């Protein structure tokens, strides 16, 4: 394993997550990247090294802190981007090993700490983020967790199709432990 302080300050840094059943993901210290089983089955939008760190449509976990605002546990809010490389930047640490990573982020402004551990399940069919939020304030805070992961749910061949139209051609069913995406029509 290895550890890096403020990993979001290193350009081009990303790691693999993979399982034995074919799920392959790339993940950055801010949870950017993609997830797929092959070139025809992407859960998240396909990315290249050029847009790996610039794509905003990716895994995210937000905390709405009553009376204070919104904080991204991944470090990608506009406020966090603005504070990067200043003394207001969140303290963050990336610890990683073979096919997993743990991102720890601390916000002085919001008095919160997040710990996000990312890996693929042993059976290799599910990408998992275990998220722990700790209140560092002396006082009780009302925090509402918000998960935001835009599902691409189609082939890399569809990357240039009109996104709104192709997303309308999906049937999405909410399940107890996630969502199921079924394309009903695709363009060739």
What are these regions (language model features)?
Residues 1-188:
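Anionic coordination/interaction segments
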């Amino acid at each position: 394993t290895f550890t890096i302080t403020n990993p979001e300050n290193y350009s081009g840094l990303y790691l693999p997550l993979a399982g034995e059943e074919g799920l392959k993901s790339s993940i950055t210290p801010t949870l950017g990247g993609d997830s797929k089983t092959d070139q025809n089955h992407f859960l998240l939008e396909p990315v290249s090294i050029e847009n790996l760190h610039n794509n905003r449509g990716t895994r995210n976990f937000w905390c709405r802190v009553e009376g204070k605002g919104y904080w991204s546990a991944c470090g990608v809010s506009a406020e966090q981007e603005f504070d990067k490389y200043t003394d207001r930047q969140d303290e963050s640490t990336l610890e990683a090993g073979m096919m997993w990573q743990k991102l720890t982020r601390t916000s002085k402004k919001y008095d919160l700490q997040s710990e996000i551990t990312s890996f693929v399940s042993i059976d290799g069919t599910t990408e998992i983020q275990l998220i722990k939020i700790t209140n560092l304030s002396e006082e009780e805070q009302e925090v509402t967790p918000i998960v935001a992961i835009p599902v691409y749910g189609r082939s890399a061949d569809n990357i240039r199709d009109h996104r709104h139209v192709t997303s309308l051609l999906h049937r999405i069913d909410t399940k107890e432990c996630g969502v199921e995406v079924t394309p009903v029509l695709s363009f060739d």
